[in-house]
From Swiss-Prot:
It is found in: Secreted. Mannose-binding lectin which recognizes specific carbohydrate structures and agglutinates a variety of animal cells by binding to cell-surface glycoproteins and glycolipids. May be a calcium-dependent lectin. Its main location: secreted. Residues 34-155 form the C-type lectin domain. It comes from the Eukaryota. It comes from Philodryas olfersii. Belongs to the true venom lectin family. A motif (Mannose-binding) lies at residues 119-121. This is C-type lectin lectoxin-Phi1. Ca(2+) binds at residues 127, 142-143. Pfam families: Lectin_C. Expressed by the venom gland. SMART domains: CLECT.
Length: 156
């Protein structure tokens, strides 16, 4: 009986110690994880629509990234900052011209907003898509012309 408990405890300790190793196992190679989602930074310059199509082609259920809570925002900020420091990054938020509200491309609810001060400003009445800004260390949003080219973040 004592040996069974010892072996069981040993296996339990081993399982917990390995749980942090390979934390991105459920994500394909080149992707990183947060909770149940996988993300990939794309080092191509594309318009918002081109970036969205790329994400859809890259992975089944792929979209430009939605950001639904502060923890996700901080994780993405940390990961993007490891790769880039002066480049804004497209995310999956855009202004619905029909409804005049901001919507995530994946259909999830906009539960929080993280606009930079003075944003969204719809400069020249042409800014309907959103980037994470490098000057905020990728924590804040700015509306941009959807036809501008930026690097981007995919999610599935």
């Amino acid at each position: 009986m004592g040996r069974f408990i010892f072996v069981s405890l040993g296996l339990l300790v081993l399982a917990f110690s390995l749980s942090g190793i390979g934390a991105d196992q459920h994500c394909p190679s080149g992707w990183f994880s947060h909770n149940v989602s996988c993300y990939k930074l794309i080092n191509d310059w594309k318009t918002w629509d081109e970036a969205q199509r790329f994400c859809m082609d890259e992975q089944e259920n792929g979209q430009l990234a939605s950001i639904n809570d502060v923890g996700e925002s901080v994780k993405l900020s940390d990961e993007i900052s490891k790769t880039w420091s002066i480049i804004d990054v497209w995310i999956g938020l855009r202004l619905s011209k029909r409804k005049s509200i901001w919507e995530w491309i994946d259909g999830s609810n906009v539960t929080q907003t993280r606009w930079e001060e003075g944003e969204p400003n719809n400069f020249l009445k042409k800014e309907f898509c959103v980037v994470l800004t490098s000057r905020s260390r990728y924590l804040k949003w700015n509306d941009k012309d959807c036809n501008r080219r930026h690097r981007f973040l995919c999610k599935f």
